[in-house]
Amino acid sequence: MACGSKRKTLIPEFDRGKEKWRLSMEHFFNTAPQAGEDKEEYISEPKSDKAPKGANPGLAYIFEHTNGRKCLIFTNSREECEAVCQNLLQYCEVNREPDRFLIHHGNLSASYRESAEDEMKDDESLVSICATATLELGIDIGRLERAFQIDAPFTVSGFLQRLGRTGRRGEPAQMWFVMREDHPEPRAIMPEMIPWYLIQGIALVQLYIEERFVEPPRL
């Protein structure tokens, strides 16, 4: 604003106080058995539904913790977004439940995206949207209870933007990570046995919490 003049520009600073987040990070193999199945499960919140038998473990977790809530389910690609939404809708059909999942990404028509946005703005509606970066910011979709993130987002800024869609109106921001990986082969070499998605998710959170690191904006 002071460009071309000798006037000083003052940037206002606001004390936002302490922020509270609620983060959860679960790791699933795409096929059974799961790690730690023989141990007592730690449950932070009771399930609100039951996924059909044979459901993908990671998607079953999302299905069982979105019923009766308004949530965003973030994916990292349009193809994955389509596949996730289709699977969740199939679980509704198998359980003979009303459809409670919508989809939102850049390849859909504007009218289709707007229809999903209008549904989310309705305070009486308890649907969830499977989305890509199109719903990271900028579009008002009302009050959300939580966001799910399938695998780790590509950047710290992406993580913060997606987390920031929740936690409004005095509630803590809430994100549940769902890391999904294939079982390593019995003779797999060490790098193939490492849960890279899980490590990437932990690293993204630590980079911001411990270093306050955020990628510089692209010019």
List the predicted regions and their residue ranges.
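Alpha-helical scaffold elements adjacent to nucleotide-binding pockets in ATP/GTP-utilizing enzyme cores
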Residues: 1-2, 83-88, 115-119, 140-146, ...
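Conserved interdomain linker/interface between the two RecA-like ATPase lobes of SF2 helicase motors
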Residues: 1-78, 181-182, 197-210
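Conserved nucleotide-binding/hydrolysis micro-motifs of P-loop NTPases
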Residues: 5, 16-20, 28-31, 78-81, ...
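Conserved RecA-like helicase motor-core motifs
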Residues: 7-14, 92-111
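Beta-edge loop/turn motif
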Residues: 76, 129-136, 143
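Conserved helicase motor "Helicase C" RecA-like lobe of SF1/SF2 P-loop NTPases
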Residues: 77-100
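Conserved helicase ATPase core of P-loop NTP-dependent helicases/translocases
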Residues: 83, 101-133
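Conserved segment of the helicase C-terminal RecA-like domain
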Residues: 123-126, 148-216
